[in-house]
């Protein structure tokens, strides 16, 4: 159940344990931090990186959260966008002569916070 509160001006969307290196996700996040919602959508749709699609879905989720709380997503901007490292999955890769090497598969947590410009003034 969602209760509507008119004093709330920011909404958050969080994606955890994304199978992606935090460094590769930060490369995309640094391009959208502080930009408006519509400008962010245009940037992410044209980016060739794999992380852009995951972050685009997360921005859509944050906009849906804003809509559920009665905020206008067209007048919002990305006030906070961060990528934190998650757990590292350790796998074994078979090698020659019966040996094996450890493969590290990193994960990350991505947080997007949308803030409303009109209620922020």
Swiss-Prot record:
Superkingdom of the source species: Eukaryota
Record has Ribosomal protein as a keyword: yes
GO biological process: translation
Predominant localisation class: plastid
Entry keyword Cytoplasm: no
CDD domains: Ribosomal_L22
Key words, A-Z: Chloroplast, Plastid, Ribonucleoprotein, Ribosomal protein, RNA-binding, rRNA-binding
Stated name of the protein: Large ribosomal subunit protein uL22c
Organism: Lemna minor (Common duckweed)
């Amino acid at each position: 159940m969602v209760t509507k509160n008119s004093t709330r001006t920011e909404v958050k969307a969080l994606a955890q344990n994304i199978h992606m290196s935090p460094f590769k996700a930060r490369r995309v996040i640094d391009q959208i931090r502080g930009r408006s919602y519509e400008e962010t959508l245009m940037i992410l749709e044209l980016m060739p990186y794999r992380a852009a699609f995951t972050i685009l879905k997360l921005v859509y989720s944050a906009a849906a959260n804003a809509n559920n709380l009665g905020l206008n997503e067209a007048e919002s901007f990305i006030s906070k966008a961060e990528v934190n490292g998650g757990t590292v999955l350790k796998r074994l890769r078979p090698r020659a002569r019966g040996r094996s090497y450890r493969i590290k598969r990193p994960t990350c947590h991505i947080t997007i916070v949308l803030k409303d410009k009109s209620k922020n003034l």
